[in-house]
Curated annotation (Swiss-Prot):
One of its GO terms (biological process) is microtubule-based process. It comes from Sordaria macrospora (strain ATCC MYA-333 / DSM 997 / K(L3346) / K-hell). Its main location: cytoplasm. This is Tubulin alpha chain. GO terms for cellular component: cytoplasm; microtubule.
Amino acid sequence: MREIISLNVGQAGCQIANSCWELYCLEHGIQPDGYLTEERKAADPDHGFSTFFSETGNGKYVPRTIYADLEPNVIDEVRTGAYRGLFHPEHMISGKEDASNNYARGHYTVGKELIDQVLDKVRRVADNCSGLQGFLVFHSFGGGTGSGFGALLMERLSVDYGKKSKLEFCVYPAPQTATSVVEPYNSILTTHTTLEHADCSFMVDNEAIYDICRRNLGLERPNYENLNRLIAQVVSSITASLRFDGSLNVDLNEFQTNLVPYPRIHFPLVAYAPVISAAKAAHEANSVQEMTMSCFEPNNQMVKCDPRHGKYMATCLLYRGDVVPNDAHAAVATLKTKRTIQFVDWCPTGFKLGICYQPPHQVPNGDLAKVNRAVCMLSNTTAIAEAWSALSSKFDLMYSKRAFVHWYVGEGMEEGEFSEAREDLAALERDYEEVAADSMEGEEVEAEY
């Protein structure tokens, strides 16, 4: 079978994972103690479990996941929370002192003591898989553990499991709402380290998701749980085709083949529709056409950037629920007639479709309305370079004065790493510019004839 191991690093990673496992359990009919619900037992056997869960001899399902954090608080909440019976206690690994928002602590000093223990557990989970497909790594860019330890883990996974795909879900620092001053440092250092190790990185930024929750769900003050439940829907959609059947199934390697034109340009933009509150759901038709269109509106995208300023290189549309291929093709045909959505000229077709028949599930008493179909869009667009340039300029402001650098150097980092990471990111921005520019030159040539 095609198993996936989820690795959750730091506070953001662990809290997103909580929402994800809550959702997977609902989708597969697994109770918080790991045993099946009565109606699930009565239904046809479900073979999709094994992607995310391993079955023990007595019919209990255990998630194939590892929680790792350098401080115990967040993981202790899981250990005492509603799902404490679900997870394997040895797969919850927490240290004693946190990384204090410092990449160097997560990557060099504190993280170094925990990494072997984590990799040992990863090895045990991996040995339990018959056909491991790859890893999903959840972490934030801004925190110390997420950035430092996350990067260290990615490096070591490349050494131990070179050929397996590694997909990242990264919480990118929001442009306006920062949780720490040194986020730009941590983000650029971790991007530089993981750039060559990740096959595909799905970025989400808190501010964009806050706005989606406020606008579409009518929540005045969304909390992290609201945000994470929305992210969980996206993660679930991306992996749904591995777990349920459908007419167009997509596996992890297929994403990379279709979304990543060059190894470094692997940061797709994520959008999800419909995000709608229960009060409004009854008034919406929620047709395939509408859902597909709303994915291309900047308001529904999970990183603050404007795709109308960039060009699309490739787009994956993953439908769930009551969708027939004919409707999906019609929706895409309509999209292609719109002038607002521009593709680079070296990639004329550009759409990859996936359809999975399992309708989306919602958490009971959650904010999202129950809908019979949904779509998740992953698109590789040159507009995401806006996010990088915003981050780089913040980095430059601080680094020009060498502000806060002593904290990193004090933990054994070299100052040269900062400039090296910054140059790497500048190169990444240039890569994006060149991809967009290639198509510009083509247009000028055509105009002359």
